Amino acid sequence: MLEAYRQHVAERAALGVPPKPLDDKQTAELVTLLKNPPAGEEAFLVDLLENRVPAGVDQAAYVKAAFLAAVAKGEATSPLVTKARAVYLLGTMLGGYNVAPLVDLLDDAELAPIAAEALKKTLLVFESFHDVAEKAQSGNGAAKEVMQSWADAEWFTSRPEVPAEITVTVFKVTGETNTDDLSPAQDAWSRPDIPLHANAMLKNVRDGNNPDKPTEIRQIKQIEALTDKVHTDSN
């Protein structure tokens, strides 16, 4: 799996795009390797776990959350992931499959503080909100902290302030902007692959869509596009 993924990374780099995240099969193989890591691959395996598995309710996220929950509860072990680290990483998964294990861990005397900090910054908890509220009403101190943090919107107030000024490069597009500009039909096959599909944006030169510096426009990291009208379709 590691050799194949490294080859994939190289192929994507040649296209100027980041590698795809791991799918559920690759993540399952990663979990197996994390439990018994090959010598010299430890840092790479940890990086894949932390940064290359999608968050939320993707099936790969399910595999990751299940593994981390098992480590946190002592049901699985890895020399590369401690119980505390497993709980912390659950807290980076935004919402979805990570929420139930974090709520359960509010009852763990050792790990409850870490689980609470994770939940304070997690908004997509859905029905699990009531589980946290019930624990708080039953006297669970960690759950009380989470409820108070949500009430105080610390998930928002703890974030960096919006910069007073933002410098951008303006690319003015005259006329109506539509799918042919932002998501050309001939590139529809790549739409699920957002970084790759982004290379097709504004590729079709037309009157009003002709960059002054076409070879440089893709190098700009932050651009403000001004247009007369954006057509209300698949864009």
Task: Go through each PLM region and give its residues.
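Amphipathic alpha-helical packing elements
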Residues: L2-V31, N36
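Residue-level signal for cytosolic alpha-helical hairpin/rod architecture
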Residues: R6, T27, K83-A84, V99
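Residue-level detector of alpha-helical secondary structure
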Residues: H8, E29-T32, F44, D181, ...
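Structural detector for internal amphipathic alpha-helices that build alpha-solenoid repeat scaffolds
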Residues: L15-K20, E42-Q59, K73, L80-G95, ...
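Amphipathic alpha-helical scaffolding segments comprising HEAT/armadillo-like alpha-solenoid repeats
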Residues: D24-T32, A55-G74, M93-D107, L124-A136
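Short helix-loop boundary/capping segments at the starts of domains
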Residues: N36-A39, N51-D58, A188, D207
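Short inter-helical turns and helix N-cap capping residues of alpha-solenoid HEAT/ARM repeat scaffolds
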Residues: P38, S78-P79, D107-L111, N140
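Fe-S-dependent hydro-lyases/dehydratases of central metabolism
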Residues: A115-N235
